[in-house]
């Protein structure tokens, strides 16, 4: 089983316009869809579609549209009640394909809520072959959160594999952490930032250089760098 954590889930709404977006105007949409979102949620949805057992850990009320949509699609989840609705992210699509994205802030985590999320992930990890910590972090969770959760999982006795799929400060903190994840997947720019490489564009154009650069992270204790 693959366990995913989406600390900052969202309800992703896409609105299609029949004319270009006009600031300050009232416009009618020609189409609209909404889906549960967040990296971990999307991973669990893809795994479920591929008939791979998965459980998605999601902060939010069981009656929230994100979680009812997961339930309706058959994705198993373990939710942490927060007393707040899950945020909505809105993408507006112009007729020529130009997109405008509006991302709302997520739930502000208190220390008590953070501890409860840690406990839920650890409890759900008992039967997991992989634990995937994915996506951005909401307010109240520091950049070191994923690194600290990796350490807590190992301290709890979890012996499976841990993947971290994030970016910017949380990724840097994860790589710098004492307890390393099993797998990370930085892009070329992030790989350069993590290793001190001078030109990420050179990595983008050279698979051989990328492999050599990624090897430095493998040598530092991360078995798989994709």
Each model region followed by its residue ranges:
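Glycine-rich phosphate/adenosyl-contacting loop at the front of the ribokinase-like
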Residues: 1-55
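Hydrophobic alpha-helical segments and helix pairs
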Residues: 110-153, 159-160
């Amino acid at each position: 089983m693959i366990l995913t954590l989406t600390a900052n889930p969202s309800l992703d709404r896409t609105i299609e316009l029949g004319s270009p977006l006009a600031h300050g105007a009232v416009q009618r949409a020609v189409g609209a869809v909404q889906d549960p979102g967040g990296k971990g949620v999307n991973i669990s949805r893809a795994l479920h579609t591929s008939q791979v057992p998965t459980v998605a850990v999601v902060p939010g009320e069981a009656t929230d549209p994100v979680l009812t949509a997961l339930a309706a699609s058959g994705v198993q989840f373990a939710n942490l009640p927060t007393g707040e609705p899950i945020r909505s992210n809105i993408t507006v699509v112009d007729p020529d394909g130009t997109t405008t994205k509006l991302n709302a802030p997520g739930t502000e985590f208190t220390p008590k809520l953070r501890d409860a999320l840690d406990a839920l992930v650890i409890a759900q990890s008992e039967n997991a072959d992989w634990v995937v910590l994915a996506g951005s972090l909401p307010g109240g969770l520091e950049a070191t959160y994923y690194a600290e959760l990796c350490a807590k999982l190992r301290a709890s006795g979890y012996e499976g594999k841990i993947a971290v799929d994030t970016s910017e400060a949380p990724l840097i903190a994860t790589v710098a952490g004492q307890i390393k994840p099993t797998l990370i997947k930085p892009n070329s720019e992030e790989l350069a930032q993590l290793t001190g490489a001078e030109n990420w564009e050179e990595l983008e154009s050279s698979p051989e250089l990328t492999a050599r650069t990624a090897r430095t992270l493998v040598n530092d204790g991360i078995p798989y760098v994709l």
